[in-house]
Amino acid sequence: MSLFLKDDSIQIREVWNDNLESEMALIREVVDDFPFVAMDTEFPGIVCRPVGTFKTNTEYHYETLKTNVNILKMIQLGLTFSDEKGNLPTCGTDNKYCIWQFNFREFDLESDIYATDSIELLRQSGIDFVKNNEFGIDSKRFAELLMSSGIVLNENVHWVTFHSGYDFGYLLKLLTCQNLPETQTGFFEMISVYFPRVYDIKHLMKFCNSLHGGLNKLAELLDVERVGICHQAGSDSLLTSCTFRKLQENFFIGSMEKYSGVLYGLGVENGQIVH
């Protein structure tokens, strides 16, 4: 499969409450053969910053992440599965490559706190908050199905992300039905249990001739084209998947195991792991 995908070769499978179980059944079928899972979430932005004295930058960043994730709700989750060569699974009668976009119901514009600019961006990107409230997935039900899906708690699954502290924060909160751990150490202990192999592209970029910038900029530099709409989780997860593969081809030889387990902006101070 070429990394230069076209819109008409991809099916973004929209998942709502009424088709959640059937789509999760499909995912259970593909994960063994396509164990690289690129992930992105959409959430209501960052609404508060902690005050006080912090020993390290990463301690401050984690406190910010924890505070926001604990009071906010995930809106969308995108998952793109691929094999070690970057091939995507095909589904349905038309044999299109499949990626998944999960729409959640809990976030309520009328009663929940949010960052106005973030919500406006998501609205402009086509997210229908009223539809999500009415037809979206119940997150507790999703968590139960995710736990038995084979994609978490599995050392054979490689999670691929971009600057993903918040993404994993929301997933951990969803999976455990609890607020995030008080400390970074506790957070990374949970990451290592639920997501044993994690690659954060933003961290990997440090080892690639000083590449910098966001996901869209990196994809542009590597000639990876977006399929779908920016700031929707399905499209962003696909761009993450393709960009990771291109980065690996261009800059890394052999196993990437030593780069696993580090999330950009968390857990590392002056090159030393502090969690």
Swiss-Prot record:
EC number: 3.1.13.4
Pfam families: CAF1
Catalysis performed (reactions): Exonucleolytic cleavage of poly(A) to 5'-AMP
Record's keyword annotation contains Glycoprotein: no
A GO term, aspect molecular function: metal ion binding
InterPro entries hit by this protein: CNOT7/CNOT8/Pop2 (IPR039637), RNase_CAF1 (IPR006941), RNaseH-like_sf (IPR012337), RNaseH_sf (IPR036397)
Cofactor: a divalent metal cation
Places the protein is found: Nucleus; Cytoplasm
Keywords: Cytoplasm, Exonuclease, Hydrolase, Metal-binding, Nuclease, Nucleus, RNA-binding, Transcription, Transcription regulation
Main localisation: nucleus
Chain positions recorded as a divalent metal cation binding sites: D40, E42, D167, D236
Keyword Membrane: no
GO cellular component annotations of the record: CCR4-NOT complex; cytoplasm; nucleus
Function: Ubiquitous transcription factor required for a diverse set of processes. It is a component of the CCR4 complex involved in the control of gene expression.
Self-association state and partner proteins as the record states: Component of the CCR4-NOT complex, at least composed of CRR4 and CAF1 proteins.
Family indicated by similarity: Belongs to the CAF1 family.
Protein name stated in the entry: Probable CCR4-associated factor 1 homolog 7
Organism the protein comes from: Arabidopsis thaliana (Mouse-ear cress)
Gene: CAF1-7
